[in-house]
Amino acid sequence: MPTEHTYKQFDAELEAVRANVLKMGGLVEEQITNAVDALISGNMELADQVDANDHNVNALEVSIDEDCTHIIARRQPTASDLRMVMMVVKTITDLERIGDEAAKIARMAKLIHQGERISLPRFSEVSYMASLVLDMLRKALDGFARLDATKAVEIARQDQSVDEEFRLNLRHLITYMMEDPRTISVFIDILFVTKAIERMGDHAKNMSEYVVYMVKGKDVRHTSLEEIEKEVM
């Protein structure tokens, strides 16, 4: 029968894993900021830094995943403890994918700034989209840290705003390309950037939904905003 000491060890292991998830989240936040800054400023050293740090994001995912595997094997968690471990495993997958999208933006920044220099009026909209997604990610990480399921509602609303911004940017970019065919190549690159940011928002939304699963025991993936509100409010 498990002793109090065993339970304390288990709790300590879970807290250590959660702390590493937040560490990974902080690194991914920095990756997004640096990637977008590299795109806007043309700072290729910053773009290179994002590319190099992607390895650190990946390494953290592998390390945390291994820790979770060991916890399941040794402790055989049940009920809410098992949901906690599963929340961590799913969360780090989405964080790693957000990191991949940030690295993609850094690569696109190199392509854009190493090509022909032309007017790039859509950077302000890219910056705005990125700010929305960064706020979503911070809220998702805060919800993870506090086990606050209500963050999922805020984030789902913001995800709708990000999706609308993407559609608006798409229309603008198509208009610019039609008006000046010389811009087609660079604006297609910017379109890939905005799509990467939109995907980041999707991953942040996923993360908030895992917290709902942890706290409420309800899977709200692929449900409407109204259904999420019903579960958590």
How would you name each of these model-derived features?
Residues 1-233:
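Cytosolic, long alpha-helical scaffolding segments
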